Amino acid sequence: MEANHQRNDLGLVALTMLAQYHNISLNPEEIKHKFDLDGKGLSLTSWLLAAKSLALKAKHIKKEISRLHLVNLPALVWQDNGKHFLLVKVDTDNNRYLTYNLEQDAPQILSQDEFEACYQGQLILVTSRASVVGQLAKFDFTWFIPAVIKYRKIFLETLIVSIFLQIFALITPLFFQVVMDKVLVHRGFSTLNIITVALAIVIIFEIVLSGLRTYVFSHSTSRIDVELGAKLFRHLLSLPISYFENRRVGDTVARVRELDQIRNFLTGQALTSVLDLLFSFIFFAVMWYYSPKLTLVILGSLPCYILWSIFISPILRRRLDDKFARSADNQAFLVESVTAINMIKAMAVAPQMTDTWDKQLASYVSSSFRVTVLATIGQQGVQLIQKTVMVINLWLGAHLVISGDLSIGQLIAFNMLSGQVIAPVIRLAQLWQDFQQVGISVTRLGDVLNSPTEQYQGKLSLPEIKGDISFKNIRFRYKPDAPTILNNVNLEIRQGEVIGIVGRSGSGKSTLTKLLQRFYIPENGQVLIDGHDLALADPNWLRRQIGVVLQDNVLLNRSIRENIALSDPGMPMERVIYAAKLAGAHDFISELREGYNTIVGEQGAGLSGGQRQRIAIARALVNNPKILIFDEATSALDYESEHIIMQNMQKICQGRTVILIAHRLSTVKNADRIIVMEKGEIVEQGKHHELLQNSNGLYSYLHQLQLN
């Protein structure tokens, strides 16, 4: 009845779903009590206020249909008649719209005409604010401004050194002018010696200061690089599990590797070229003093460089985007192939995999070649402008010298000064590919750094967990347009109780434990531990007090001891050995040559499947968690290993709440209570013998299948 009542207020339903999309839990009844004061449903103003109270940033806008592909989705399409719906995706190629019908509780694909018929032009855009956990500010080029301010003293020193370098660059042409116009004409050898010594001193200072500037600048940018790299990794590990499940491993690795492009840009010559370019106005003033006509030629060339860059840049950026996509595909395929090498060899599909790799590699090389060709065309265009300006200046300068308006020394000095102006422009133009590449890299890296971290609405870090668990009216799906996984699940688990959960594949058993670990926030309802809502709890605090053993566990390339004591490297050896004995792992570990110091290899490749599983069980037990989850933990074990675990099960379960998920019913038959799930709902519960008495029940049916 409560769900039906909520379904009548589509605004509240939409708010619940959008909050869940951003990993924020809410109590619909509490929102209704606070903001639906007249009982007629949430108005536009109250909806925005309710979103703000949930740490969501909501904005009401009016947007034409033709521009909907530019907005951040999913968004709420607000209707004056109250029949709101969610806009999930816009397919501009086929003029189709993926929406979510809140009344029918199902996704819909609408054609252009169908969407125009129901769209009234009003949208509510929803994004998550920075959480209490701490979310990085939006990552783009502006991210580097605070970093530059932080090291402003060092950058100020670099600026001062640059000023002196420009002064030296200004003095050198004057020396040449004096030599050409004075020394050679008057045969002044003593003056020549003085100028030569002075020029040598200037050159030495210029070399030393230039090297010093490069060193100081590289040192500062390296610090920024370290900060960015550290924040990137911390942020990556703070992202919700859904981020990784929705992306290929290779894609994520490829985005993280974009940090190398930013690093090369920061430590390269591009930024020092920008500093040199800033001093060009001083050179222009001196050049104007020599010859306004020649200076106008130089000034006239600058728009040519800019226009050429404007012409090349969009094409180059598109090709760089394509190159990145091909590279990410290759990275993902390579990671997938290496990870699945046992399957590839077992099925003898290496030729097919090689053929796929060859095609993808050829596509990447072709894309990379197109980038190189376009970059070469861009650089040659810059060279053409430079050579053309040089020819014009030579012709015009010679005319000015012949007419007596300019001396030979002044012409030489002018050309040297113009070289100081044009050189950083040319370097920047030639490095334009790097500018474009680093822009792509910042965007790609922003996909990681701008993704919201796991959020919680309070600072709830409770004392040690006791073990009471409660699922209240849980409704959950992994995506707004995905099917419902859990539907109106209610379950109470008492402290110290051993619960078995069984059911067909896809019935929602593992999803229930993922909600308990707060990997996801339910769309509706609450998950409570000791009466406290997990939506308000710090995920790290929670997970440190829950032990989890999965069917496929990952071991790190470290020693057995380090893997068991992963959460506390300084843990006493006695605790490690005790946990290993409980898990039935101590005997086989003792037989190894290095014992607990044996390196297990990448993902535990040096051990058998049963040995890996027992070490994973020991790792889950070593912290003495009050809640223990076995998700098909014994299904990969041989019967002897499983027998050892089951013998110790009474000790393992003592003093803690245990949830056993299994397809093999023999694993759960001694549980205090067995929960039977089907299509996201609890259909039966009771002890083993009680469930068998219901011959028409699902548990009895599964039991009969296993007996046969």
Swiss-Prot record:
Its EC number is 7.4.2.5. One of its GO terms (biological process) is protein secretion by the type I secretion system. SUPFAM superfamilies: ABC transporter transmembrane region, P-loop containing nucleoside triphosphate hydrolases. GO terms for molecular function: ABC-type transporter activity; ATP binding; ATP hydrolysis activity; ATPase-coupled lipid transmembrane transporter activity. InterPro entries: AAA+_ATPase (IPR003593), ABC1_TM_dom (IPR011527), ABC1_TM_sf (IPR036640), ABC_transporter-like_ATP-bd (IPR003439), ABC_transporter-like_CS (IPR017871), ATPase_T1SS_HlyB (IPR010132), P-loop_NTPase (IPR027417), Peptidase_C39 (IPR005074). Its main location: membrane. It catalyses: ATP + H2O + proteinSide 1 = ADP + phosphate + proteinSide 2. It is found in: Cell inner membrane. Residues 1-126 form the Peptidase C39 domain. The chain crosses the membrane at residues 159-179, 192-212, 270-290, 296-316, 389-409. ATP binds at G503, R504, S505, G506, S507, G508, K509, S510. It comes from the Bacteria. It is a multi-pass membrane protein. GO terms for cellular component: plasma membrane; type I protein secretion system complex. SMART domains: AAA. Keywords: ATP-binding, Cell inner membrane, Cell membrane, Membrane, Nucleotide-binding, Translocase, Transmembrane, Transmembrane helix, Transport. Homodimer. Belongs to the ABC transporter superfamily. Protein-1 exporter (TC 3.A.1.109) family. In LktB the peptidase C39 domain, the ATP-binding domain (NBD) and the transmembrane domain (TMD) are fused. This is Leukotoxin translocation ATP-binding protein LktB.
